Amino acid sequence: MTGDQPPEPLRIGVLGAARIAALAIVDPARTTGDRLVAVAARDRHRAEAFAATHGVERVLDSYAEVVADPEVEVVYNPLANGLHGPWNLAAIAAARHVLTEKPSASNATEAREARDAATAAGVTFLEGFHYLFHPVTRRLHELLATGELGQLRRVEVDMVIPAPADDDPRWSLDLAGGATMDLGCYSLHAHRMLAPWAGGPPRVVAARGGERAGRPGVDEWLDADLEFPGGATGSARCNMAGEGVRMTCRVVGDRGEATAANFALPTMDDRVTITLPGGRRVEHLGTRPTYTYQLEALRAHLRDGAPLPIDADDALANMELIDACYHAAGFQPRPRVSRVGRRGSPGRPG
């Protein structure tokens, strides 16, 4: 790129016609000017409707065709949790960069395979923790980095949503469902991102969880107690059958504390409340979508070499912490899908 010439648009291929795609990739691409060059879904009619509604350039017959399409340089994967790992690996094998919805895999073993493959292929692997790119989270980190809150002592992150429909794949063990996979991944990731001010990443001390009625092995809620090397403690809570929506992050230091009212989706509430000995103030950090910041960061990385704050190693570390929470709470880590057809239909879990 020279002078004022804008960077070349990213060429993005979309796997599936999931609802999240409109929020997480379609709207951001409209803002950034990046191209949605191809989409495929298990039902071609759904893919055609998605393309017509959202301006995707071409409809292909299968996920495999999207991954292999020479026009696609970035594969966006918003499929059900259990299909993240297999199709991320397929995209990496085709030398495509990957932007995957979280969690990046069904378990740490699968995440390690993706990390190793991405490293060997030299491709970018970004797990979609979009909140990390927003000024709300950057402000929380800044308050610790500048010492305004003092030494980190306590972190509390709550992720709560009302229950999805009974047939939602987030309740399917075979598709790597559960509250910790859908919501707790944020709670744990937010803790892990505080490692620079906590002496290192946290470990699980204890965890408790409740099983969804009629869904053996699937957690409806899970609370994890964490501890950092520097002595700070944490509470990572998630509930996928709660009352209302709550996505708060509270950071407590020995000089003060700060709470983000909705760190995961600040478009809904961008307040950060800072409490210090001299009083309390509320800062509004802006409701621009987190997903737009994320796509801008990915483009800056791929076009200009700007660093990203997370990579495939981070995705593996987060899955390792998720698996540790499951073990501590008496659950098994999620099984992986053993076979996936060209259109993305799962085989029996392995």
Question: Across the structure, where does each feature detected by a protein language model lie?
Answer:
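N-terminal Rossmann-like dinucleotide-binding module
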Residues: 1-54
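NAD(P)-dinucleotide binding in Rossmann-like oxidoreductases
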Residues: 215-219, 229-293, 311
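A contiguous active-site-proximal alpha/beta segment in oxidoreductase catalytic domains
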Residues: 82, 105-164
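C-terminal helix-rich "cap/oligomerization" subdomain common to oxidoreductases
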Residues: 1-9, 74-76, 229, 300-350
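Beta-loop-alpha module in the N-terminal Rossmann-like domain of NAD(P)-dependent dehydrogenases
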Residues: 54-117
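Hydrophobic residues in well-ordered beta-strands that form the structural core
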Residues: 60, 100, 125-127, 260
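Rossmann-like dinucleotide-binding domain that binds NAD(P)(H)
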Residues: 168-233, 238-244, 313-316
